[in-house]
Amino acid sequence: MQNDVDTQILMKNITKKYGEHLILENIDLQIRKGDFICIFGKSGGGKSTLLNIIGTLENYDSGDLISFSKLNPIRDAKDRDYLRREKIAYLFQNFALVENMTVEENMKLAIKYRKVKDKAGCITSALRAMGVSDKLKSKVFELSGGEQQRVAMARNMVKPFDILLADEPTGSLDYENKMIVIDSLIRLSNEGKTIVVVSHDNDFKQIANKSYLIESASIREMR
């Protein structure tokens, strides 16, 4: 694997342990601009850990993580903060929404410190794209799980990012909401965004241009 201008994330020999338990061992992975990657594997097998390391949300024990064609690995908090703020968006299993706030208030938090001319317009447009613009004034706890997931997707669409990391984005959804989320991911991919999904959903094999399996702390590409 070579670090070229289209490489957004390059992992070299990444190893991660929880205590004495080996989760990931000598992982090599290259994520290039425009990739739609899906990572499969058993529950507890290291998929979410890998995603968190890619997103600089979790440390690793050895190896190197290099981002956006830089020559040197990510080492300090300043680099990690920059990636999280400017380059990477996250879609978590628990949606990471503030339940006692309205949808509008949650959306405003996402762009509070962004230089966006028409924040209200951006919020409305993103919610409309996800089919939840009518929930603007609703409290998050009043929404169904599917609606919360779609709001979480919309929230990611109002902030600038190059890579979207999604942890089981369709795991708890009915078919209708699942297809809305999948269609949104495809649309983002078609717009040039890089998508990395962790999932048990085999439908992603038909969508992703690269699929990987994590097994016994190792990763291999699926054909």
Where are these regions (language model features)?
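Helix-to-loop junction immediately C-terminal to a conserved catalytic motif
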Residues: 55
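ABC ATPase NBD Q-loop/coupling interface
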Residues: 64-82
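Conserved signature/switch motifs of ABC ATPase nucleotide-binding domains
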Residues: 85, 138-141, 159, 191
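Catalytic Walker B motif of ABC-type/P-loop ATPase nucleotide-binding domains
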Residues: 164-167
